[in-house]
């Protein structure tokens, strides 16, 4: 699984508008990261996804957290116990 995750991280970073990607488990443990997103961000990203999920009563509704700034967006979503964050530069 680790090799597959590493390949997905590398493939994601091939997109020129993406400058960072991070995967974390539900405990905030960094499973892998590239670019602008690092180990220090894993806990916060995991908690943001968990807190956003509490805002909906529909368990099948999986929210996307989007942090916007002038320099770009960080999109965060949880998938089957793994939270993925992607840092995309503004176009």
UniProtKB/Swiss-Prot annotation:
Highly expressed in skeletal and cardiac muscle, followed by pancreas, kidney, liver, brain, placenta and lung. Elevated levels in both cancerous and non-cancerous liver tissue of patients with chronic HBV infection compared with hepatic tissue without HBV infection. GO terms for cellular component: cytosol; FNIP-folliculin RagC/D GAP; late endosome membrane; lysosomal membrane; lysosome; protein-containing complex; Ragulator complex. The keyword Acetylation applies. Keywords: Acetylation, Cytoplasm, Lysosome. Coiled coil: none annotated. It is found in: Lysosome; Cytoplasm, Cytosol. Pfam families: LAMTOR5. InterPro entries: LAMTOR5. The modification N-acetylmethionine is found at residue 1. One of its GO terms (biological process) is viral genome replication. Belongs to the LAMTOR5 family. As part of the Ragulator complex it is involved in amino acid sensing and activation of mTORC1, a signaling complex promoting cell growth in response to growth factors, energy levels, and amino acids. Activated by amino acids through a mechanism involving the lysosomal V-ATPase, the Ragulator plays a dual role for the small GTPases Rag (RagA/RRAGA, RagB/RRAGB, RagC/RRAGC and/or RagD/RRAGD): it (1) acts as a guanine nucleotide exchange factor (GEF), activating the small GTPases Rag and (2) mediates recruitment of Rag GTPases to the lysosome membrane. Homodimer. Part of the Ragulator complex composed of LAMTOR1, LAMTOR2, LAMTOR3, LAMTOR4 and LAMTOR5. LAMTOR4 and LAMTOR5 form a heterodimer that interacts, through LAMTOR1, with a LAMTOR2, LAMTOR3 heterodimer. The Ragulator complex interacts with both the mTORC1 complex and heterodimers constituted of the Rag GTPases RagA/RRAGA, RagB/RRAGB, RagC/RRAGC and RagD/RRAGD; regulated by amino acid availability. The Ragulator complex interacts with SLC38A9; the probable amino acid sensor. (Microbial infection) Interacts with hepatitis B virus (HBV) oncoprotein HBX C-terminus. This is Ragulator complex protein LAMTOR5.
């Amino acid at each position: 699984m680790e090799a597959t995750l590493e390949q997905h991280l590398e493939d994601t970073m091939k997109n020129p508008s993406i400058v960072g990607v991070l995967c974390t488990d539900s405990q905030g443990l960094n499973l892998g990261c590239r670019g602008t997103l690092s180990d220090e961000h894993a806990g916060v990203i995991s908690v943001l996804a968990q807190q956003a999920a509490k805002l909906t009563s529909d368990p099948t509704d999986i929210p996307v957290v989007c942090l916007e700034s002038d320099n770009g967006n960080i999109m965060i979503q949880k998938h089957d116990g793994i939270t993925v964050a992607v840092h995309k530069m503004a176009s």
